[in-house]
């Protein structure tokens, strides 16, 4: 019985971490006040790939994260979880955010500023951010 408790607790902790990370992606998608279906698709695909879960499970996490994003008023809450991961993972998150931003073909000042702030909180250099941004732009052409 105790073993089941810890397994359940571990699963809840993992879901909470995922929800915070996904909420950051949603926040990036909403920053231009235009949360599109294309952005949702990118986020959902990311959820499924990173967590190796089904479409239905991804939908559940997406709903939880959307609620979390609506309740929060600062990105620090979302980035504090990502700080615990490797630099490689952090860079991957920035890449995903740029893909979300450029899903509509352009980037505005609010989106660029948000990504700069996220990079600062995650200790990602302007150089690395610029390289990722350029790579994503070239990939989506």
Residue ranges and their predicted role:
Residues 1-141:
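Small-residue-enriched hydrophobic alpha-helices in membranes
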């Amino acid at each position: 019985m105790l073993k089941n408790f810890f397994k359940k607790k571990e699963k809840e902790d993992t879901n909470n971490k995922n929800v915070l990370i996904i909420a950051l992606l949603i926040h990036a998608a909403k920053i231009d006040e235009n949360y599109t279906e294309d952005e949702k698709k990118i986020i959902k695909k990311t959820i499924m790939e990173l967590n190796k879960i089904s479409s239905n499970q991804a939908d559940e996490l997406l709903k939880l994260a959307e609620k979390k994003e609506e309740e929060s008023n600062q990105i620090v809450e979302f980035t504090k979880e990502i700080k615990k991961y490797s630099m490689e993972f952090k860079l991957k998150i920035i890449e995903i955010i740029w893909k979300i931003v450029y899903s509509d073909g352009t980037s505005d000042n609010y989106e660029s500023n948000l990504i700069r702030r996220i990079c600062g909180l995650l200790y990602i250099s302007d150089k690395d951010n610029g390289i990722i941004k350029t790579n994503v732009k070239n990939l989506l052409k």
